[in-house]
Every structure is written in C-alpha cells, then in structure tokens.
From Swiss-Prot:
Residues 251-457 are annotated as: N-acetyltransferase. Catalyzes the last two sequential reactions in the de novo biosynthetic pathway for UDP-N-acetylglucosamine (UDP-GlcNAc). The C-terminal domain catalyzes the transfer of acetyl group from acetyl coenzyme A to glucosamine-1-phosphate (GlcN-1-P) to produce N-acetylglucosamine-1-phosphate (GlcNAc-1-P), which is converted into UDP-GlcNAc by the transfer of uridine 5-monophosphate (from uridine 5-triphosphate), a reaction catalyzed by the N-terminal domain. This is Bifunctional protein GlmU. Its EC number is 2.7.7.23, 2.3.1.157. It comes from Clostridium botulinum (strain Langeland / NCTC 10281 / Type F). Mg(2+) binds at D103, N227.
C-alpha cells in the first residue's frame, strides 16, 4: 500500500508577531514543521509534500535537508484550498495520503502509524484525528453515528444544543484515500461567510458519496496547534517533559526536570547526572557517567564519558573522557580537548587542540593552538594569536610547562619537554629540553622614594 503525506505550512501566523513564517519557530531546538516531517518519516512515510506560501524561501531554507517536495499556495484561501494547491503532488498516485499541519509539532510517530493502520484496516475513505477536551468551546465537534463512524463535523457556531454538549473535537489532521480526496476536491466550494475552501467540507462531501469516515482519538497535547508565543511556550513545556522523561527512562538523573532544558536531538548516556539550570542544545552527545553541574550550556558538542562540567559554556567542540571543565570556562567552536584534561576557572579556549592529561587550571586564553599531552599552563597565560590582520597558530609539544603570566606571541613553537619562566613573553621557538626566560632584569633603585619625597614617615 502506497502512503504519502501533505503538511500544510503556508499560514502567515499573524499572532506570532514575527518576521519569520510561523512553522519555522522552534520547539526544543527544532522548527515546528521539522518536528512534523521527522515524525512522519519515523512512521515510514517517505513521500512528503509541504504546502508553502508566505515566507516560502525561508521555509525551504529550514527544510532543505529533509528531502521533501513543495507546493505553492500564493493566496491563503483556506485549508481545502491548500490541499487543492497540492493536487499536482497527488496526480497519478493511488493509495493513502495523510494531511498534517506544520504548526502542530507535538504529533507523535506512534499516532501517525496508528492513523494509517486504522484507516487502511477499516477500509475507510477518510479518517480524522480527534481529541476529547473538557472545554470544547470554539472547536468543531465530531458527531458520530451509532456505529461509531463519523457522521459530520459541526463548527461551534453552527452547533445545536445537543451538539454543544459533545466534547470530541476536530484536529484538522486527516487521512484520505487519494482517489476519494481528489474527487471530493472537485466538488469543494467557498460558499461561506469567509469565502474560503474548508477541508472539513471534504469530510461532508465524502460522507454524502456513501463512503465510510472514521476517527481516532488521541490526547489533546498531540493536536495542539501553535498560533501565538504563549502557545509556543506551552508546546515547549510539553515537549521538554517528553524529552526529559525519555532520558530518565534511559538512565539519566535529573535533579530538577522543571529547570533543565534539553533539545530534542540531544543524546545522553546512562548514569549521567544533570543539575538545575543546564541547557543542552542542538546535536549534542553526552556519553555515560557525566556530571553537569548547574548553569552549564552545551551546544552541538560531543562530551566523552565521565566528564564533569561546572558552570561553563561548550560550543561545537569535543571533550574527551574523564576531563573536568570549569567553573566558568568558555570552550569555543572547533576545540578538541583530550582525555583526563583539566580546564579550570575563567579559561577560554578557541579553535584549539588540547592533548590528554594537560592542565589549564585558571585565567588563561588559548586560541588557534595545538597543545600536546601532559602540559601545564600557569595562571594568566595568554596565547596572543591575532597580529592585527590575521589569526596565527601556536604549537606546543608534550610535557611543556608554561609559567604564570606568560605571553606566547603567535606564530610560535614550543617543543617537547620545555619550561617557560613566569612572566615571559615568548616570540621565538623554544627548543626541546630548554628553559626559556624572556623578561626584563629586575632593577632595585634604593632610596628612590626618599629622593622623590614620597616616603611616608
């Protein structure tokens, strides 16, 4: 059986008050429309078409790696009109098409699979997703036959007294036999107060043709649409709870779930402990047995097993197993830190490689450098990597000892097994086995304060 999906992503999203199309706003680090696409794909639906409109180039840019096709809706004339715009996508296809909305990011792949299975096994011409809510005010009601089949969808304003008591509501997400849908679209009109073409009318047309219409009921959170920043925040809360629950089931400890923020694509190994206030973003991988203390942010990075991070920021970098980072360290993009290293307080590292067992304990800047293993950086060391025009490279070998308050003027090379005296400014290569001293000789001028009249008596 051929299955495909159409995702409606052309809405303007006026209530978002944003220059961006609504569907590219993110929930837990991923665009809403990409949440829907990815869950459709997890349900083994490979052929996906997006109906796009306002801000189409932006939507294309955010979905370019999702292998989808596009249909253009120049004017937003209703959900039915959006599907009419995708008729070319459905042309010559036989099978089943599901229709989802790009602003409902909480739909799960399990529900999508259930929708197709229910639709196909029941031999329905159309199947819709519904939900039951305590307060259905404003929603279209699902009115069922005694057999359980869907009889009709009635908009709230058109409900009679009995229909107003119904608390099963329409989600705006459907499954259709493709041939039935295309035939029904031919009979769709905009004879209503808004002058729009409604997809709900397709259900009525299908029913009048004598075809079966069914519905599956899912939790409300799965069909919750996002039309404002308030609803975006509500969707974020639901998604964050799902994400944190998944990690806890897989053996991760959260000291406080409510104040821990993890993006949807993050992977975390078991026996990792995460303290309040941590933010883990993008395609980050945290391996097993790590401890992330409060107020740490990690983005698009790989953190090896047994790493301890405290009050620090790690961006687009790799930290080897058994390393400690922080407090208050800043690991900038393209940094690779080896195993069992120590990156201490107020240390900034940028676009550098740090070898195994190297210690950079405090108040140090390392940029555009290659640092070997078992090195020690004293407090206040600075790799001076910018010459005023371009960034230059520094190379430091294994077992180098860099004394406190040292400046390494790039480009420069410090070879294996070297010592640099505290307070030095190194501008030339330091040979292996050498002690480098590059500082002015101390001069004591005795009686100078007395001569200047500055001596306090």
């Amino acid at each position: 059986m051929y299955n495909c999906a159409i995702i409606l992503a052309a809405g303007k999203g006026k209530r978002m008050k944003s220059s961006m199309p609504k569907v590219v706003h993110k929930v837990c680090g991923k665009e809403m429309v990409n949440h829907v696409i990815d869950n459709v794909r997890k349900a083994n639906i490979k052929d996906v078409n997006l109906v796009i409109g306002k801000g189409s180039e932006t939507v294309k840019e955010h979905t370019k790696d999702r292998n989808v096709t596009y249909s253009m809706q120049e004017e937003q004339l209703g959900t039915g009109h959006a599907v009419i715009c995708a008729e070319e996508f459905l042309k010559d296809k036989k099978g089943t098409v599901a229709i989802f909305t790009g602003d409902a990011p909480l739909i799960t792949n399990e529900t999508i699979q259930q929708l197709f299975e229910f639709h196909n096994s029941g031999k329905y011409a159309a199947t819709l997703i519904s939900s039951t809510v305590q307060d259905p005010t404003g929603y279209g009601r699902i009115i069922r036959e005694a057999s359980g089949e869907v009889k009709k969808i009635v908009e709230h304003k058109d409900c009679n007294e009995e229909e107003l008591k119904v608390n099963e509501i329409n989600s705006g997400m459907y499954c259709f036999d493709i041939e039935v849908l295309l035939n029904s679209l031919k009979n769709l009109n905009n004879d209503n107060s808004q002058g729009e073409y409604y997809l709900t009318d397709v259900i009525e047309i299908t029913k009048k043709s004598g075809d079966k219409v069914g519905a599956i009921v899912v939790p409300y959170e799965e069909i919750m649409g996002v039309n404002s920043r308030v609803q975006l925040s509500e969707a974020e809360i639901v998604m964050r709870k799902r994400i944190n629950h998944k990690h806890m089931v897989n053996g991760v400890t959260f000291i406080d779930c409510e104040s821990t923020y993890i993006d949807v694509d993050v992977e975390i190994g078991n026996d990792t402990i995460i303290y309040p206030g941590c933010v883990i973003q993008g395609n980050t991988t945290i391996k097993e047995g790590c401890t992330l203390y409060s107020n740490s942010r990690i983005c698009n990075s790989v953190i090896g097993s047994g790493v301890i991070v405290e009050n620090s920021v790690i961006l687009e970098s790799h930290v080897g197993e058994g390393t400690t980072v922080g407090p208050f360290a800043y690991i900038r993009p393209e940094t690779k830190i080896g195993k069992s290293a120590r990156i201490g307080d107020f240390v900034e590292i940028k676009k550098s490689t740090i070898g195994d067992n190297t210690k950079v304990s405090h108040l140090t800047y390392i940029g555009d450098a290659e640092v070997g293993s078992k090195c020690n950086f004293g407090c206040g060391t600075v790799v001076v990597n910018y010459d005023g025009q371009r960034k230059q490279k520094t190379i430091i070998g294994n077992n180098a000892f860099i004394g406190c308050n040292t400046n390494l003027i790039s480009p420069v090379k410090v070879n294996d097994n070297t010592y640099i005296a505290a307070g030095s400014t190194i501008t030339n290569e330091v040979p292996e086995g050498s002690l480098a001293i590059a500082r002015s000789k101390q001069i004591n001028k005795e009686g100078w304060l007395d001569k200047k009249g500055l001596l306090k008596k």
